[in-house]
Amino acid sequence: MMTETIRGDDLEQYRYCARCGEHLTQKLLDGRVRPVCLSCGNVVYLNPLPAVAAVLIQNGRVLLIRRGVDPGAGLWALPSGFMEQGETPESAICREVFEETGIKCSPGKLISATTHDDHVFGHVLVLAYSVACEIRDATAVAGDDAVEAHWYDTTSLPCLAFDTHRDIIRQAEVLYSMEHHEIL
């Protein structure tokens, strides 16, 4: 049976029970060390944070943003971010693309569901979708936590903030070529 190791700093943030306020104890449950309240029995499950990443490819170029904040400040990334309470992945994708590029879009197909261990946010579940611009050849204008937006040739990508984004772009290219029976 495979178990994941949880970083000590992940467990350290859970010192008191959210239900009763008593101190939490680290206990091995189901093959994992988990914060547990011995007073009321509450178990804290350390679940991944859901995030979305958008892949807009037009004419062999992919839309990237230069991040203005950590993690990865100054590096390039797909338009992406965390889902908000009450959002679907599809609505989160459209919101993130608009906030970071000013482009209105509609969600396409799910390209990938992968995980990423981030030094700031911990374990992140990344849902990547293809998206279609509502206006062909739309001009991207950086906004929100993006300081720049640019279309890059998929064969010459800049240094990306997240390895998962490079993998997602490659997966999108493969799916596109399979759907259109062509080699990119």
Where are these regions (language model features)?
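A broadly conserved sequence feature marking short terminus-proximal activation segments
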Residues: 1-13, 155, 159, 171-179, ...
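Conserved Nudix-box catalytic region and its N-terminal flanking loop in Nudix hydrolases
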Residues: 4-7, 57-99
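Active-site-adjacent beta-strand/loop module that shapes the phosphate/pyrophosphate-binding cleft
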Residues: 114-138
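NUDIX/MutT-family hydrolases
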Residues: 141-172
